[in-house]
Amino acid sequence: MELKFMDHVGTASPEEIARFTAMAEAWWDPQGKFKPLHRFNPVRLAFMRRHFAAHFGRDESLMRPFEGLTLLDVGSGGGLLSEPLARMGFAVTGIDAGDKNVAVARLHAEQTGVPVDYRVSTPEQLDPNEAFDVVLSMEVVEHVPDVSAFLGHATARLKPGGVFMGATLNRTAKAWALAVVGAEYVLGWLPKGTHDWNKFVRPSEFAAMLRDRGITVRQMAGMAFNPLSDTWRETDNLDVNYMLFGVKG
C-alpha cells in the first residue's frame, strides 16, 4: 500500500488525502504504521529492477543501471520507492496530493542526499509535454474513486515504448480475509478502515483498463507473506497482493 494518491481535481478523494496525511510523520518508521510497506519493499524493488533492466537493456548488476532514464512515481507518499529508485540511477519525479506527505519526503531526501523532484501534484496537473520512461502507481488505485480516469491521466505521462508498473489488491474473498480483516482488525498492521474491499481491482480489470490506453501487460506477480519468518516473497499467486508490468505501444 503506497496508499496515498488521491487528488482534488478529477480523481479526487479528500477523505483518503486526510487519512494518509494524518499518518505522514510515520512514513520512514520501519516499525510504525507503514511497517507493511517497509517489509515488502525489497520484493517490489527486486521485481522492478529485474524487469526494467530487461526492457531497457541495462546491466542489472550495476549500482546505477538506469542512468539517463526518467521515472514518475504517482502517489509517492513519503518516498519509500522514489528514493531507492533514484539510487538506481533514475531521474525520479514523485507526485502526491498530500502536501504533508511531500514535505516529509523532501526532508528525508535532503537528509539522505538522494535527488528526487517531489511535487504536490496530480498527474493531470503536470505539464502535458512532460513525459517519462517509467510511470509507477503502486498500491494507489484501490484508493481512488475512479480507477479508469486515474489511469488515463497517469498513463498519459508515459513515453511510447515506456513502462507502466502498478500494484494493488485483488478483489477476492482471500484478499478481504487477509488484507482487510487480518491486516486491519486482527494484526493491527493498518488503521481500521484503510481499505475498502469493493475498491480492490482484479488483475483482468487492471489489464483491460491499461489495454484501452495502449499498454500491454507483459508480466504479473503476486506477493505472499510468511508469518513464521515475517518476510514477503514473490509468487505466482495473484489472489491478494499483486504487481504488473506493462509496455506502451
From Swiss-Prot:
<feature type="binding site">
    <location>
        <position position="96"/>
    </location>
    <ligand>
        <name>S-adenosyl-L-methionine</name>
    </ligand>
</feature>
<keyword id="KW-0808">Transferase</keyword>
<dbReference type="InterPro" id="IPR010233">
    <property type="entry name" value="UbiG_MeTrfase"/>
</dbReference>
<dbReference type="GO" id="GO:0032259">
    <property type="term" value="P:methylation"/>
</dbReference>
<feature type="binding site">
    <location>
        <position position="138"/>
    </location>
    <ligand>
        <name>S-adenosyl-L-methionine</name>
    </ligand>
</feature>
<dbReference type="GO" id="GO:0102208">
    <property type="term" value="F:2-polyprenyl-6-hydroxyphenol methylase activity"/>
</dbReference>
<comment type="pathway">
    <text>Cofactor biosynthesis; ubiquinone biosynthesis.</text>
</comment>
<comment type="function">
    <text>O-methyltransferase that catalyzes the 2 O-methylation steps in the ubiquinone biosynthetic pathway.</text>
</comment>
<keyword id="KW-0949">S-adenosyl-L-methionine</keyword>
<feature type="binding site">
    <location>
        <position position="44"/>
    </location>
    <ligand>
        <name>S-adenosyl-L-methionine</name>
    </ligand>
</feature>
<feature type="binding site">
    <location>
        <position position="75"/>
    </location>
    <ligand>
        <name>S-adenosyl-L-methionine</name>
    </ligand>
</feature>
<dbReference type="Pfam" id="PF13489">
    <property type="entry name" value="Methyltransf_23"/>
</dbReference>
<keyword id="KW-0831">Ubiquinone biosynthesis</keyword>
<dbReference type="InterPro" id="IPR029063">
    <property type="entry name" value="SAM-dependent_MTases_sf"/>
</dbReference>
<comment type="similarity">
    <text>Belongs to the methyltransferase superfamily. UbiG/COQ3 family.</text>
</comment>
<dbReference type="GO" id="GO:0010420">
    <property type="term" value="F:polyprenyldihydroxybenzoate methyltransferase activity"/>
</dbReference>
<dbReference type="GO" id="GO:0061542">
    <property type="term" value="F:3-demethylubiquinol 3-O-methyltransferase activity"/>
</dbReference>
<keyword id="KW-0489">Methyltransferase</keyword>
<protein>
    <recommendedName>
        <fullName>Ubiquinone biosynthesis O-methyltransferase</fullName>
        <ecNumber>2.1.1.222</ecNumber>
        <ecNumber>2.1.1.64</ecNumber>
    </recommendedName>
</protein>
